[in-house]
């Protein structure tokens, strides 16, 4: 980690955070506004090294996006790269069945398609929330391991925990695509999966 955020490309460093998956949107927004204010030419002077707004915007957007922040954090911890496409056993078959069911239920010829869309959106949002909660718990184990804790029931090694994060992130991407499929403007003939 560099001490000078103007020389960094890491969103955590740019906004002055110690890398952590658990940072909140409020913390990100506050840090972003502080850096943006400090970088304003009227306040910082022309000679001061400042961060350009595009860099700050990118850092903020990355840290506000759960998946992007998790990938950044996993990279920071030395975990598997996004090129690792490991998925839970049976997951692809389940996704194929869900996609078929969603397409059938959202077909405009189905008289209940509007109600089905709402139900599937609720399901997808719950899946997303569960994934983020799971990732948060695993990252907490990696960020602050406490061998004396009686509440930590995990016996997984740090490498196994990192692989678990990658597997959850890969599954999360599929769920995100299902959420996109629920958009009323979604066109199955132009889908990229």
Language-model-detected regions and their locations in the chain:
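C-terminal accessory/regulatory regions appended to core domains
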Residues: 1-193
């Amino acid at each position: 980690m560099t001490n000078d955020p103007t020389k960094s490309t890491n969103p955590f460093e740019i906004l002055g955070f110690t890398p952590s998956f658990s940072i909140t949107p409020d913390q990100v927004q506050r840090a972003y506004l502080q850096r943006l204010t400090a970088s304003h030419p009227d306040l910082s002077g022309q000679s001061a090294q400042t961060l350009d707004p595009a860099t700050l915007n990118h850092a903020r957007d990355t840290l506000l996006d759960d998946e992007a922040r998790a990938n950044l954090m996993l990279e920071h911890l030395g975990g598997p790269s996004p090129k690792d496409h490991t998925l839970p056993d049976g997951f692809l078959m389940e996704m194929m069945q869900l996609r078929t069911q969603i397409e059938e239920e959202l077909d405009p010829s189905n008289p209940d398609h509007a109600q089905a869309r709402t139900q599937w959106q609720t399901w997808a949002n719950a899946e997303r929330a569960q994934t983020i909660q799971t990732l948060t718990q695993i990252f907490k184990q990696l960020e602050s391991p406490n061998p004396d804790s009686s509440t930590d029931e995990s016996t997984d090694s740090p490498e196994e925990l990192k692989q678990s994060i990658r597997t959850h992130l890969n599954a999360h991407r599929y769920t995100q695509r299902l959420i996109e499929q629920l958009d009323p403007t979604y066109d199955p003939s132009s889908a990229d999966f």
